[in-house]
Design a protein with these regions (language model features):
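N-terminal strand-loop-strand
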Residues: 32-206
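Cys/His-rich microdomains that often coordinate metals
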Residues: 23-24
Length: 335
């Protein structure tokens, strides 16, 4: 007689699309909300491949016996590295950044992802959206805002109806109790009391949520293709540990972003918005290569964790290049 609990078999077969592990579903996942993406770099010197540098560095460190052809190639790499002015390193590396078509808080607001009685959260949310988005909220109906966001006329689903009810209630205005005091607030009042004045939505790196049974690297490549319109075979994934960005968002939920590092194969590739790419057209407003300083300054000041990802990567690449350059010079003197 089989006395095994059937629920345990179900748990073993279940798959969490959040953390990518078996044994539970995403609603029961204890991990932060996970997105996976790629930070793609461009090195503004021809014939410098970061994966090759990392590989050769390990071989030199491990006293690998190089062939004559490999030594000739190493000498060519040294000649290229000798042209690099590390005092101008900030302009040597460029990073591929994307700008959201709509700010994250605006999307959450239109989707009704808030407690209408949570005044503190609503104040933060309205503060983090752009000036243009505030004007749209102030001057347009919910039907218009919904269609403008999603690019379709699907106004019959449950999320639309629930979000519409919340929006119209906020438009009309309502009283809530805060610290035992009845406070009146409305959309107009929230907009009037905003402090920040952002001109454009957030800039960041291509990333997104996992599909069912999708591995981390598969998710990262798919999201990269959808958001940049650059095929993943046009980049090389660098043999580096993925970087992580973990933070507590304004909705009090914990998020974790995992970024693989990649190098573009052809420096002449110009990123652009492709109107035939529906995923990109709906989600992405702009895309471009940026120097380290420009990228660091365009990321919103409160996105400290994202700035740290960029800074740590930038310093790490510099260390890899400098360390290889020094060890290569010492090695070639012995040949």
């Amino acid at each position: 007689m089989d006395t095994q609990d059937p629920s345990k078999n179900i748990d073993k077969k279940s798959f969490c699309i959040n953390c990518g592990k078996n044994g539970h579903i995403s609603k029961k996942c204890l991990c932060p909300i996970i997105s996976i993406g790629i930070v793609c770099i461009k090195i503004n010197i021809d014939d410098i491949d970061l994966n090759s540098i990392i590989g050769y560095s390990k071989k030199i460190q491990n006293n690998y016996l190089f062939s004559i052809d490999e030594i000739i190639k190493l000498k060519k790499i040294k000649n290229i590295l000798d042209t690099i002015n590390l005092n101008n390193y900030e302009n040597l590396i460029e990073y591929l950044l994307i700008r959201r078509k709509n700010s994250l808080n605006y999307v959450e607001f239109i989707r009704g992802k808030y407690d209408i009685n949570n005044l503190d959260y609503l104040e933060k949310s309205i503060n983090f959206i752009t000036s243009d988005e505030r004007e749209m909220i102030k001057n347009h109906s919910f039907d218009f805002l919904w269609k403008n966001l999603w690019g379709d006329n699907n106004i019959n689903n449950i999320e639309f109806m629930e979000s519409c009810d919340k929006f119209n209630l906020l438009k009309k205005g309502l009283y809530i109790k805060k610290n035992d005091i009845n406070i009146y607030f409305s959309i107009d009042r929230l907009i009037k009391d905003t402090v920040y004045n952002f001109k454009e939505p957030e800039w960041g790196f291509p990333k997104g949520r996992r599909n069912s049974r999708e591995k981390n690297i598969e998710c990262a490549k798919r999201e990269f293709e959808e958001e940049t319109n650059i095929l993943s075979d046009k980049i090389n994934i660098i043999n580096m540990t993925p970087l992580e960005e973990t933070y507590l968002a304004s909705n009090n939920l914990k998020y974790k972003h995992i970024y693989y590092i990649a190098q573009i194969k052809n420096n002449d590739i110009i990123p652009e918005i492709n109107n035939n790419n529906n995923e990109q057209k709906i989600e992405i407003g702009d895309i471009r290569w940026m120097s380290f300083n420009n990228a660091l300054s365009i990321i919103r000041e409160y996105n400290i964790e994202k700035k740290n990802v960029l800074l740590n990567l930038h310093l790490n690449i510099r260390y890899i290049i400098e360390n290889f350059k020094d060890s290569l010079e010492i090695f070639l003197k012995t040949q």
